[in-house]
């Protein structure tokens, strides 16, 4: 579907046993009529993280730092964020709030310019995190923004300059760089597009942020990078082993994340991968070292599933590999007891609740916002199809001896998010009491204010840089926002019952305090 001249497309490069082939289809720039070719430069989004991690390890090999160092050793002004180590930043166990959610809650819009310094200022303004460092895993762009700043402080160079000198140039990645300034010229760059009913529109990307994102590259350059893991030109065997060290939460076995890469078994083989998505850009790099195989997928179309393309190529190319195992799926059906164990309410993100019910024969899904329940087909006793066309599914542990403690929201081959079970209490909204919630609410951490008002019988939050956000009550003093900037709002009261403030929970950024002031 991408081999056309009226839509964005895909650049794909494959390496097997040292031989590389590539294919490009679609348009890099619809306005200029420029097709994608092997020199087209794409934004690689979160694929950037493994380069940032590698830069940190190069500095460790130089004796300039250790990944066991506390962050405050290199960024003293971050000491108040807690006893966070560089390793915890690398493996998403730091507990830092997510920078994207913080910026959105502070009033930043998708089309706004976002710079490294603005992100750093926002992160340093935080007074607490989502959890104590080292006690949980939670994906965090914030950690990699701070790692990029560590590279700058320790090396005396920007992340772009350091990587250009130490990684890109030695590997011959001539079309690769970190874009840390929107003023930088990038010949051959692809534009970003999203689908509409009649075609595509541009999706602006105004990041000048390097570290968690910001890498501009080609599919063939990514394969040069992939080859370096098995035949090092930059780094050595010890450094490559360091890159494979999977993160660990206290008291648990090592997780799947390892310094900008994910380790997953697939068809009987170990795979190392990472994807990315920003605006309309999609990326995925998959390595299967035992098969001497790598595939890089880059796209400027928001509807492309880059992970599915990458694994689909692996399925075709490696079908005859001696260790390759065909896909299998359990045929068992869920029992009534299992269905009862699965039924309940689960919170994927703050105030985003999946309600699962059963009639004893199958499961039903709804979001708890007046939506009609949807029957969930069950390919197996633990897997339920939410949207087969997008390969979205809900998965549960097989134990039926007690109610499930969580469900897994599987996003195709891109990974699985965990939604813990919650207990919703019987609740009846009382709009007569909403006036006591109005007023101005100020956040020192976000350096912003919201005005809460009653408008046409609804509680509405207003901000000078965002459209009005409707607040829908679903528990006592607890509201869900119509915009992710205010995803979940919980009002705080003193001993006399007076509203003193609110607590804001956003995706991956929780417990942000606002103080109430009178209108």
Language-model segment annotations:
Residues 66, 103, 174-177, 236-239, ...:
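Short, polar/charged, Gly/Pro-enriched helix-capping and turn/loop motifs at alpha-helix termini
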Residues 4, 8, 16, 25-141, ...:
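Active-site-proximal loop and beta-strand segments within enzyme catalytic domains
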